[in-house]
Amino acid sequence: MKNISEIINIPEDYYDLYGRYIAKVSLNVLDYLKNKRYGKLILVTAMTPTPAGEGKTTTAIGLGNALKLLGKNAGIAIREPSLGPCFGVKGGATGGGKSTVEPSNKINLMFTGDFPAVSAAHNLLSAVINNHMYHGNELKLDPKNIVFPRTIDMDDRSLRSIIVGSGDRSTGVMMNDKYVITAASEVMAILALSRNYNELKQRLGNIMIGYNLNKAPIFARDLKVHGAMASLLVDALRPNIAQTSEHVPAIIHTGPFGNIAHGTSSILGDIIGLKMFDYLVTEAGFGSDLGFEKFIDIVLRLSDFKLSAVVLVATVRAMRYHGGGRINEPDVNAVLRGSENLMWHVQNIKKFGFNPVVAINRHSNDTDAEINAISNILTKNGVEFSISDAYSDGGHGALDLAGKVLKSISDYNPRYIYGINDDPEEKISKIAMNVYNANSVEFSHDAVKTMKLIKDDFSDLYVCMAKTQSSISDNAKLINVPEGFTVKINGININSGSGFIIPLLGNIMTMPGLPRRPASENIDIDDYGNITGLQ
């Protein structure tokens, strides 16, 4: 690794060092960069993933490295890892092989403290809510109708439903409560969407915490706590910069999940990156049905920058899986069947007005016959593609991909799935039927009740669907390209601070659980404090 000062092309007055290899950028760097034009934004998405993921982050990093090798002024912008997946199923989120961001262990394990700051600000509000009710409840908050949860950056299913204040009066007001993982916290979404401190504080104040006894919504600003919450996030709003394995600057900031949140790194990081670099590569969580849709329908609407190219990551193993084969066993016929999922994502991206470049992320047990089968399908359908060896060869393995992405860059005008003035129920239905392939949408009794409140007070909010990442549908068991199904809306969260409602589809959980053999079993330190086993 190089000292971070060697690769950041901005004066030292505009960033603070966190050791030799990490820096936090000050927001006033935008004054320094104000006369710079935006560069070209390249978004990396994927086909419907297997549990281990398809290498979207690895591809984004490799693409950034390749652009540098081609002599381009390039950077990347990705999300910060959550401890939940690090210790759970998926492992770390810093790429892999020869396409990583460094120092990877530091980045994976709490980094510069942004996640703990989000958790602290979030839980401060939770503490103040209960404290307000304990000390007389001037706002007449209904303890049975508090909708703001608590948060922790860990997978822990035992916290999905809890009771607080269950002792004597000294333990506070007894009520039902729950935890969400920090990546699904509304405060995390607010941090990712805020462009300055004033907007941050305003959004925090707009968080709806619940209802009073007269059924009127109550907000964080009513408790006069949003300023204190913002004080905990002063440094967290500042984007972090590290570096790739080939010394490309990497903006790594905020970490909302793509399935239960909006799934992209911060808008502020994108703005700064697009001013610093001619080409900025970013990524959106999970498949094009999740993070990509939310990037178009939410992030681009809130921003003044444009998206210039889209990369769609595909793998042979994912096509084996969607074709009914075994993930690690070569099977050309399964790949041919599973390619329907890939082609569905190609067409889905085109619905939004973009022509993607498919990056086939090659794995060691992919056979030539399988690669050729996919290549023939893409060629037959006129889809630009490249075989990416970013994992094994770093930037050199993504040079062909980089060249094709550069050729694909265009002044695209996105086509949004819904209008901001559409009825909230119509917004949800348009996403379900136009993006998820559903025949119809069914709202539960609880969802219908919440929808009435939304129509009265929050009809102008965006929609951020929470659903499984393992299927285009709301049912993780329906692989490949399911048809003829009904999307079930089992509840709706109102995140008025972040500016969207979150319909809860199928059996989606905002607090994951650990698997039978969590990744934490493999992580250790040696006698010198070196971390091992973090993948």
From Swiss-Prot:
Pfam families, A to Z: FTHFS
Pathway given in the UniProt record: One-carbon metabolism; tetrahydrofolate interconversion
The entry's keywords: ATP-binding, Ligase, Nucleotide-binding, One-carbon metabolism
GO molecular function, one term: formate-tetrahydrofolate ligase activity
Assigned EC number: 6.3.4.3
Top EC class, one word: ligase
Keyword hit for Hydrolase: no
Residues holding ATP: T50, P51, A52, G53, E54, G55, K56, T57
InterPro entries found in the cross-reference section: Formate_THF_ligase, Formate_THF_ligase_CS, P-loop_NTPase
One biological process term in Gene Ontology: tetrahydrofolate interconversion
Claim: Nucleotide-binding is one of the keywords in the record: yes
Chemical reaction(s) catalysed: (6S)-5,6,7,8-tetrahydrofolate + formate + ATP = (6R)-10-formyltetrahydrofolate + ADP + phosphate
Record-stated family: Belongs to the formate--tetrahydrofolate ligase family.
HAMAP family xrefs: FTHFS (MF_01543)
The protein's name: Formate--tetrahydrofolate ligase
Native source species: Picrophilus torridus (strain ATCC 700027 / DSM 9790 / JCM 10055 / NBRC 100828 / KAW 2/3)
Gene this protein is translated from: fhs
